[in-house]
C-alpha cells in the first residue's frame, strides 16, 4: 500500500521552487532600496498591488454573504506582518542573519502547537528543531555566548518568523474548527 499522495513528486517540486524563490526575495528588496525606495516603502510597494487585486474579491464575498468572519483576516494580518518583517529585515541586517532567524520558524510553530493546539511533536520534529537551533548557534553564538540577535534587523527577522508561525498555527486551528462544524451539520 502506497500512502503517498498521487501528486507527491509534483507537490515536492513546487515546494522546492517556491522555497528557492522565497529565499531570493531579498534581491528585489535591495534593488528597490538602491533605486531610492528606502526602508519599509519597498515592502509596501511589493504588497499594495496584491492587496488591491484581492480587495474586490473580499467585498464580493461579503456582499454574497460568504464571509468567514474575522478568522481569515486575522490569519492574513499575521502572515502579512511576518512577510513585512522578513522583507524589512534584509534592509537592516546581513542577508544570512535574516534568513537564519526567519527560518527558525519551525521552533515557534512547534511551541505554539504545543501550547495552543495541545499537539506533542513527533521525533522527526525534534531533529528539525535541533538542526534549526544548531544553525542559529553556529552563526550567532561563535564567542561561546548565548546566541542573541545583535541589531534591529535581526530582531525583526525573528519577529517575522514568529508571526508566520502564529498564522500557520491559527490557520490549522481555524481549519480544524470549520471542518468539525461541517461534519456536525451533516
Tell what function each PLM region has.
Residues 1-41, 85, 130, 147-172:
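Glycine-/small-residue-enriched transmembrane alpha-helix faces in small-molecule transporters
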Residues 68-76, 121-132, 154, 179-180:
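Cytoplasmic-side transmembrane-helix entry/capping segments in multi-pass membrane proteins
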Amino acid at each position: 500500500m502506497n500512502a503517498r499522495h498521487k501528486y507527491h513528486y509534483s507537490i515536492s517540486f513546487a515546494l522546492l521552487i517556491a522555497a528557492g524563490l522565497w529565499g531570493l526575495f531579498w534581491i528585489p528588496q535591495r534593488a528597490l532600496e538602491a533605486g531610492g525606495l528606502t526602508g519599509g516603502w519597498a515592502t509596501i510597494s511589493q504588497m499594495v498591488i496584491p492587496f488591491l487585486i484581492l480587495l474586490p474579491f473580499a467585498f464580493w464575498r461579503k456582499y454574497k454573504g460568504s464571509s468567514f468572519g474575522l478568522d481569515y483576516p486575522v490569519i492574513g494580518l499575521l502572515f502579512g506582518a511576518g512577510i513585512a518583517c522578513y522583507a524589512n529585515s534584509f534592509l537592516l541586517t546581513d542577508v544570512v542573519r535574516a534568513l537564519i532567524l526567519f527560518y527558525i520558524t519551525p521552533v515557534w510553530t512547534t511551541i505554539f502547537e504545543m501550547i495552543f493546539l495541545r499537539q506533542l511533536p513527533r521525533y522527526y520534529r525534534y531533529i528539525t528543531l535541533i538542526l534549526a537551533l544548531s544553525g542559529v548557534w553556529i552563526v550567532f553564538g561563535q564567542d561561546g555566548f548565548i546566541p542573541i540577535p545583535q541589531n534591529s534587523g535581526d530582531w525583526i527577522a525573528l519577529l517575522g518568523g514568529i508571526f508566520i508561525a502564529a498564522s500557520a498555527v491559527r490557520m490549522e486551528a481555524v481549519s480544524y474548527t470549520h471542518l468539525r462544524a461541517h461534519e456536525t451539520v451533516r
